[in-house]
């Protein structure tokens, strides 16, 4: 389960996880001193939401800019094991092509846990989402291939499939070029 409160009739549901982390920016410049070209490198540090772990061990100044080494929860995409159009099942190759993801509004969901705060379309694991600290995590969701009309999400998504029939399955069709 991607999240106990998030379930919907869609082909795919994606959980996108970001962590607030230190990021190092390197700026180099060359100058001439006593007839020799020298290079000066300046490092600056700021914090950003990132979906990948930023390894702070390689920073020029790691002290005071240390990031966690792992995320408590990972990004993940769940895909329905069986997808039908009419009486035909889509092959895995066709299901893979359904990737027009739309952001899922979390407005009508409750905060799932005392340690989790919902702000906008994110769940935050943070003391205060307005003022995040390094190591705080936020999670958003998106979906693709809405399979039926939904009062909150709108009409079912229209998917155009060019395929070949094999029994009760639709499989990718390719022309000889």
What are the residue ranges of the model-derived segments?
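Charged, low-complexity helical/coil segments in non-catalytic cytosolic or luminal regions
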Residues: 7-177
């Amino acid at each position: 389960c991607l999240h106990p409160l998030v379930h919907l009739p869609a082909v795919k549901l994606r959980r996108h996880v970001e962590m607030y982390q230190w990021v190092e920016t390197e700026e180099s410049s060359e100058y001439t001193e006593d007839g020799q070209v020298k290079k000066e490198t300046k490092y600056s540090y700021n914090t950003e939401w990132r979906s990948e772990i930023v390894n702070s061990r390689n920073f020029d100044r790691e002290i005071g800019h240390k990031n966690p080494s792992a995320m408590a929860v990972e990004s993940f995409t769940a895909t329905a094991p069986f997808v039908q159009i009419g009486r035909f099942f889509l092959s895995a190759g066709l299901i893979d092509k359904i990737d027009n993801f739309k952001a899922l509004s979390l407005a009508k969901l409750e905060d799932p846990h005392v340690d989790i705060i919902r702000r906008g379309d994110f769940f935050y694991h943070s003391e205060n989402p307005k003022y995040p600290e390094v190591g705080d995590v936020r999670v958003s969701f998106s979906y693709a291939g809405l399979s039926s009309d939904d009062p909150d999400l709108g009409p079912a998504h229209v998917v155009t499939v060019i395929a070949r029939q094999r029994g009760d399955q639709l499989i990718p069709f390719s022309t000889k070029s």
